[in-house]
Amino acid sequence: MDLDAYFYPQGLTLLQRWQAGEAAAKTEIKDVFDAAIAGEFDQNFSILAPADEVHATASVHMLALAILHDIYGVTADEYYKTDPYRYVRANLTVSRLLGVNKLYITWALYAFSCEVLGQKMMYPDKFPPGSDPDHALINKDNCFELETPDFNSRIPKIIDDILRVTEELTGMEPLLQISAPYSLAADIYGQEPLLADVLHDPDHVNKLLDHLADKVLVPWIEHHFSVFPNGWVELSDASGSPFFIGPENCKTMSIRSIQRMDNGDLWGGRVFDCNYRGDY
């Protein structure tokens, strides 16, 4: 099978037909993903977008999960955690079908970032995981007891394996994607308690963000660069965006907690932040 046969807009049309529940489209899309998972498109994935153009890209892992669940019965837990080759190939194939030339591999990064610490999670069968909002990992009394996790097993190893496969298939430099301090705090402390402290105890919030940076994110970033010296790190901070906590709090809490890491150098500029709801 030739993936180029599904060059835009043919691939997008196939996805639309599949989403509409057309039986023939489901059969066809299964043939595409059978070939993808078998490695038949690996050569295609090595063709990267031109560097002298401006590209749009997309996070497609949720759509890839929906497809694999529909045609193979793969659950979210299996999809994200058990087979890095299947995961990467499925995501790259979805990008090609959508007509996205700039390949980009991500995962349920907010969920993974807090699961590393022991946060209770919710794993639906066909939707991405998330932290359980009814069972926050930390509170105001114990939040500074949080220690550095092991980055050589479980979720960090799963991410490392995904990055190794991505680099092998595409040649792209490995890009670690994890939560920024504020969004990590929101997922393990609770959105509402954290917002209350933003209003009434901002000093505590800043101390908490610095603790998470020092104990979790900085060691994780340093682990990443020890494994992938040519790597990059993308911090995401939707919860810390100006739309959620206001522009001034975004500056003095979210952005401040990032900029203080690595004495402000941010590993020679190889660590950056995005996902401020378009405000970056």
Predicted regions and their residues:
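Active-site loop segments of alpha/beta catalytic cores
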Residues: 1-69, 73-78, 101-103, 147-280
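Short, acidic/polar
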Residues: 84-94, 217-221
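A contiguous, low-structure linker/loop signature
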Residues: 109-147
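Membrane helical hairpin/interfacial module
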Residues: 88-122
